[in-house]
């Protein structure tokens, strides 16, 4: 790190300023300022969201003096993975960072009506949750660019005096013209009553905006709305991010997203030090304390090695992202699922199918749209692979290529047998794909898909489903949830009244929130105080020791010995603050479990690999042996890549056997239920 005198009065904006004051400060700045995504999107894009607050908080003292516009440290998938894997509460993270970097605006990423989940929530849930979260900058996007869906979030955020950052989801397509984007910006400006209290973000989540295109778009927006402050969020996947950032800045963008150079891999964002140098060499001043930025980059190097295991197996930049458009934030989780499902070798075919699919069903591949795309397209490829092997995978990619690229999606121009095959293409698509077609997320950017897509997804009921399709925003079509009933249900489940923050976690992710609460009741603040290597692997050898502080007191734990297993019990000897203690640890012996597969007409199998997160449905609750179910009724739900996949009764029947339990991991085709016709 170079020795350099620290800049004085480098803080441009800070918590407590009004939105008008923040916008005015950025607007009057000569050059650009920066948002660091090092505490959130860097981890989501290249490290499976596994970066722990234990390590990230070490950057806070540098951020506090760096002169950042904001630090994106909250929201997106970090919220969910936090409670599910890292066992950290997003509320804890805010509290820790508020204390350590009081000069920095804390920024979240929120998915309009989907909040920090993957489905639309009712208006009263949105208003309740948004009013309780202590965040300064609310970046809000819609994967459909349906600005109507932002209304509830915008109203609460602006009423609270926090900065609302409405966001355009950006892609490159024949329909994604300047005229289209200007119409979205107009809707945003109308929603927010002008440009004085907002900052507009352009979210290039896949990194597909070429140098000319992004500069042209920002120039068009600035010509129409010269006072509008613009921020550019741009992933590096295509390898052309830095010149695109420069093009955006030259066209009038005021803020750019960056991350520590030492965090940069393949799917995240551009390196902060390199961007600062590149911009200033190009004549654009950058508001940044370079000394503190260098220190932050170096601090990351001290702990990033603990996360090598979380990096994507798909190495290198990928300019073909301009075709398949998988967003940077979805790469690691998609590859993780492909590895676990043993279909990583099919990734080239899946990405090819995605590039064709996104011309048939047009929306933006960003959460939850990216999960819908991934589960749908990977499901198609895996089904053909299972039924026909590699030849089947080649066949389905060629079929789609012929339909999209050669026949220009003229269904009638395809051969009869090809038409029949297309009409089965989406028959096993996930429930969220079907919800998308039914308008349950909002309206698609440039209209609904062709009728054959509905025939393919819904079979004989396609015409009925089109008539049921919603044109309203979920804010207007969903009824309110009974919050007190939900709170009471959580209290009954955990055996006490939930804290306010626990209830909000539950509203977002009921199953995972309950598991989080149980875990933290058992293990306390261990996720916050244990070093990352110990958190992940524990103390492995006699003599291994960990030192930490808890509530201001020092603790030391040393592993002395691990005894032999006897009847499923192992005695572990530890020294805790030099006092020897013996712990009896249950270690159930692994039992070989036979996986039963569905083979008969009255046996219902899993349509995909996933986790059983509901048995029954919200309307009737859990179902059990002996219950009567009706044709078309949901009898269970599997989760895969954060998407719901409803299991539907094929006919009126009685449940003869329930073959799985909640939270079981199941394989495609595995037996879920045995039913008998009634």
Predicted features, each with a name:
Residues 61-68, 124-138, 182-202, 247-256:
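Structural recognition of alpha->loop->beta junctions
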Residues 205-398, 415:
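Catalytic alpha/beta core domains of metabolic enzymes, predominantly
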Residues 40-46, 79, 166-176, 198-210, ...:
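Active-site-proximal beta-alpha loop/turn segments in soluble metabolic enzymes
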Residues 75-186, 206-209:
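Active-site beta->alpha loop and helix N-cap motifs at the rims of alpha/beta catalytic domains
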Residues 34-39, 69-73, 104-112, 136-139, ...:
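Hydrophobic faces of well-ordered beta-strands that scaffold small-molecule active sites
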Residues 1-121, 125, 132:
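N-terminal capping/small domains of soluble enzymes
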């Amino acid at each position: 790190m170079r020795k350099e005198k620290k800049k004085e009065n480098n803080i441009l904006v800070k918590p407590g300023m009004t939105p008008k004051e923040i916008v005015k400060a950025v607007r009057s700045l000569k050059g650009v300022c920066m948002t660091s995504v090092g505490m959130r999107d860097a981890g989501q894009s290249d490290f499976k969201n596994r970066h722990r607050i234990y390590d990230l908080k070490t950057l806070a003292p540098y951020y506090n003096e760096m002169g950042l516009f904001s630090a994106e440290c909250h929201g997106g998938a970090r919220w969910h993975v936090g409670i599910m894997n890292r066992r950290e509460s997003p509320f804890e993270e805010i509290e820790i960072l508020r204390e350590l970097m009081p000069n920095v605006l804390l920024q979240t990423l929120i998915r309009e009506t989907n909040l920090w989940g993957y489905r639309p929530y009712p208006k009263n849930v949105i208003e309740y949750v948004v009013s309780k979260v202590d965040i300064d900058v609310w970046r809000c996007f819609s994967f459909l660019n349906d600005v109507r869906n932002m209304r509830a979030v915008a109203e609460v955020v602006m009423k609270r005096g926090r900065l609302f950052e409405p966001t355009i989801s950006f892609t490159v397509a024949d329909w994604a013209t300047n005229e289209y984007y200007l119409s979205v910006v107009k809707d945003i400006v109308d929603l927010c009553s002008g440009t004085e209290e907002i900052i507009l973000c352009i979210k290039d989540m896949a990194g597909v905006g070429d140098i000319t295109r992004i500069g042209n778009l920002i120039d068009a927006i600035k010509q129409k709305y010269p006072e509008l402050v613009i921020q550019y969020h741009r992933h590096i996947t295509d390898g052309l991010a830095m010149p695109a950032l420069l093009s955006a800045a030259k066209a009038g963008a005021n803020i750019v997203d960056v991350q520590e150079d030492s965090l940069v891999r393949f799917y995240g964002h551009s390196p902060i030090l390199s961007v600062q140098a590149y911009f200033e060499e190009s004549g654009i001043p950058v508001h940044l304390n370079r000394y503190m930025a260098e220190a932050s980059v170096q601090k990351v190097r001290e702990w990033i090695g603990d996360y090598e295991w979380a990096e994507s197996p798909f190495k290198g930049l990928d300019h073909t992202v301009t075709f398949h458009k998988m967003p940077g934030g979805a790469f690691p989780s998609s590859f993780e699922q492909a590895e676990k499902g043993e279909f990583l070798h099919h990734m080239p075919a899946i990405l090819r199918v995605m590039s064709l699919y996104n011309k048939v069903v047009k929306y933006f591949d960003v959460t939850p749209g990216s999960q819908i795309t991934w589960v749908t397209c990977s499901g198609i490829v895996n089904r053909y692979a299972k039924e026909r092997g590699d030849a089947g995978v080649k066949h389905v990619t060629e079929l789609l290529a012929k339909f999209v690229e050669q026949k220009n999606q003229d269904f009638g121009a395809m051969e009869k047998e090809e038409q029949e095959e297309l009409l089965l293409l989406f028959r096993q698509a996930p429930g969220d794909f079907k919800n998308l077609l039914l308008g349950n997320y909002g309206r698609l950017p440039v209209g609904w898909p062709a009728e054959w897509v509905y025939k393919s997804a819904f079979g004989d009921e396609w015409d009925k489903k089109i008539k049921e399709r919603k044109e309203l925003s979920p804010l207007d079509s969903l009824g309110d949830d009974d919050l007190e009933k939900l709170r009471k249900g959580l209290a009954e489940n955990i055996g006490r009244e939930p804290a306010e923050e626990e209830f909000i976690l539950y509203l977002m992710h009921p199953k995972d929130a309950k598991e989080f609460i149980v875990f933290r009741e058992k293990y306390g603040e261990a996720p916050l105080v244990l070093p990352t290597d110990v958190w992940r692997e524990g103390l492995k050898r006699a003599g291994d020791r960990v030192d930490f502080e808890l509530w201001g007191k020092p603790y030391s734990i040393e592993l002395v010995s691990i005894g032999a297993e006897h009847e499923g019990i192992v005695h572990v000897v530890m020294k805790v603050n030099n006092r020897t203690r013996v712990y009896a640890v249950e270690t159930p012996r692994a039992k070989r479990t036979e996986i039963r597969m569905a083979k008969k007409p009255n046996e219902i199998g899993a349509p995909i690999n996933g986790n059983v997160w509901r048995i029954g449905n919200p309307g009737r609750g859990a179902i059990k042996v002996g219950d009567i179910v009706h044709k078309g009724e949901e009898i269970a739900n599997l989760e895969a890549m954060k998407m719901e996949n409803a299991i539907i009764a094929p006919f009126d029947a009685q449940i003869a056997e329930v073959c799985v339990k909640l939270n079981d991991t199941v394989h495609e085709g595995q037996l879920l239920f045995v039913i008998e016709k009634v």
